[in-house]
Amino acid sequence: MGSLGAILKHPEDFYPLLKLKIAARHAEKQIPSEPHWAFCYSMLHKVSRSFGLVIQQLGPQLRDAVCIFYLVLRALDTVEDDTSISTEVKVPILMAFHRHIYDNDWHFSCGTKEYKVLMDEFHHVSNAFLDLGSGYKEAIEDITMRMGAGMAKFICKEVETIDDYDEYCHYVAGLVGLGLSKLFHASGAEDLATDSLSNSMGLFLQKTNIIRDYLEDINEIPKSRMFWPRQIWSKYVDKLEDLKYEENSAKAVQCLNDMVTDALVHAEDCLKYMSDLRGPAIFRFCAIPQIMAIGTLALCFNNTQVFRGVVKMRRGLTAKVIDQTKTMSDVYGAFFDFSCLLKSKVDNNDPNATKTLSRLEAIQKICKNSGALTTKRKSYIIENESGYNSTLIVILFIILAILYAYLSSNLPNSL
């Protein structure tokens, strides 16, 4: 759970954190007994605990398909991300990956930590993939083939223009959106969404990650990973790595705000995509990451810490998003709240201020017109009045900790 200091500062986070912890224990007990499926679900929880939690809400067949889709693409991404692999070796693997998933003898050692285990033991993923229905397999193969080819293209090509940036993000994330839409449709639960809306769902998430991960990517050893488009950063500095130096802070923040403004263009499509979903489990599966994305953009905007260290939503706020996101009204409320936070951080002297404000106002207009912004809803950005007595907070924390320990020890084994 979150640290004691964070919980004392935000006591309203404790109950969502408690529920999240119990849900995580519940999810871990849902791991199937078959060795290949046990490996896949265990690995899913290791590479993405939050994704592992949300996926558990899907129906059994769709859950299995999405689990394998995710692991196949994580494996593909591990090959792409490993800068120690030569281009001559990497490109053919990326191009042929869609065939490797049918071969339960294939594996390729690369990556680190849990990703190395995923690659070394990839036969488990292949065996699970072969268990899926034909509609699911065809969708996964198609997206893997297209993504591998796109990744291979950008191994040999730098991201120069905004069009290049959009194309790269399409290959590595927009195609994930298209693939998930195909899986939802194959399950019979949803109509097939348009490629344009599906693509925007992926691009909004990917661009957020690229913005947030600037420092990690630029410091990658043995070779930097550079995804910010030259068309944007060259307006502010001579080299992309110059953004991390303190003497360039003013220009770096302007460049950062330019990148965030570019990402915001996809928000309206994302709201449309989510509003068309019918199934509550699929809706939550899609909505939670999108709220996390706009929340992360709000934290990153105008924030020099992006160039100094890690910027991410506190764990308690993440737990609140997972706990409170049930309906489209919740999504409209969250997007409105975080767009308000973004708007409050816009400096009128910023060269992109007019464009940024225009995009934020378009998001806010959609949220207001939805009729979902009632006075009774819980806000993500307006903190509770700090009238808490510190002693009472500590007592409350102790009581809730005891309650959590009791609930944890008494969870039925069948959960």
Swiss-Prot record:
The chain crosses the membrane at residues 281-301, 392-412. Keywords: Endoplasmic reticulum, Isoprene biosynthesis, Membrane, Transferase, Transmembrane, Transmembrane helix. Its cofactor is Mg(2+); Mn(2+). The keyword Chloroplast does not apply. The keyword Transmembrane applies. Induction: Induced methyl jasmonate (MeJA) in adventitious roots. Gene3D superfamilies: Farnesyl Diphosphate Synthase (1.10.600.10). It catalyses: 2 (2E,6E)-farnesyl diphosphate + NADH + H(+) = squalene + 2 diphosphate + NAD(+); 2 (2E,6E)-farnesyl diphosphate + NADPH + H(+) = squalene + 2 diphosphate + NADP(+). GO terms for molecular function: squalene synthase [NAD(P)H] activity. It is an enzyme of class 2 (transferase). It is a multi-pass membrane protein. Its EC number is 2.5.1.21. GO terms for biological process: farnesyl diphosphate metabolic process; isoprenoid biosynthetic process; response to jasmonic acid. Pathway: Terpene metabolism; lanosterol biosynthesis; lanosterol from farnesyl diphosphate: step 1/3. It is found in: Endoplasmic reticulum membrane. One of its GO terms (cellular component) is endoplasmic reticulum membrane. Component of the triterpene saponins (e.g. ginsenosides or panaxosides) and phytosterols biosynthetic pathways. Catalyzes the biosynthesis of squalene. Belongs to the phytoene/squalene synthase family. This is Squalene synthase 10. It comes from Panax ginseng (Korean ginseng). The gene is SS10.
